[in-house]
Amino acid sequence: MTSAANKIRKAQTNDPELIAQINKISTVAAAMWMTVVGTLGILFLPLMVGGIISELGFTEKLAGYIAAAEMAGVAVVSGLGVFWVRRINWVTIAILSTVLFIAANWISTGVTEYWPMFASRFLVGAASGALLAIGLACQSDSKNADRIFGYWVACQMAVSSAGYILLPGVRATWGLDGFLFALIILGLTAFVSIVFLPARGLNRASAQEKQANKILTSALALGGALFFFMAQGGLWAFLERLEHSCMLSKLLFFFQI
């Protein structure tokens, strides 16, 4: 019994080298960028929706379903991350997810039918969700997790701002395929982050008496996030179509975003 207890205690003890690695600037930066790559599809969803409507001739209803498929992929895989993100090798999953992100975006460039596009965008979302879950888990293990989360949001908004200045021109010049290839190029940068990523995170085992409070607060936080993104998601996907219906200048509209 004593031997078994010692093994469990040892397994629950975090390696000092792992703690040091997770708090390195290179690891923090890698985790931040990985989460940015994991949100690229959602950040630039209006450009994708506008492209499949104007270039592929999909109705707004079908385009909405395709956008929902991509967001569902992110939600399902990142949501299930509570079960797998502490149990699976981060580097392996990050490599597979990045390959899937690139491959699914590449497949999307040759698709003109609804169901293949629906499936490919769901796969993009699933890959994005895995990268997002790993990146956020790595950030949360840092000793300055709250501050790093703020830096990540700032980085995400900076990338979004630059993207909405540059990517509309890319789509106008090279079409929807050009936009998707831009996502592929950005996705390739995730491999750089993987180089600095630890294979696993810290052990998050906690005392039983604290679990009830954690479950309650987590449920409230998740509920609030759910309602926020439900309100935001439907409008966000069709943001470019609002510009189109109001006949605004695309350059000015995306610059304002």
Go through the PLM ranges and name each one.
Residues 77-90:
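Helix-to-loop junctions at the C-terminal end of transmembrane segments
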Residues 130-143:
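Intracellular juxtamembrane helix-capping segments at the cytosolic ends
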Residues 104, 115-123:
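Paired small-residue
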Residues 57, 110-112:
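Helix-breaking motifs and short loop linkers at transmembrane-helix boundaries and internal kinks
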Residues 168, 179, 184-205:
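C-terminal membrane-cytosol helix-exit motif in multi-pass small-molecule transporters
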Residues 45-46, 218-257:
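Extracytoplasmic gate region of multi-pass secondary transporters
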Residues 92-106:
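Structural signature of the two symmetry-related core transmembrane helices
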Residues 146-165:
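Glycine-rich segments within core transmembrane alpha-helices of 12-TM secondary carriers
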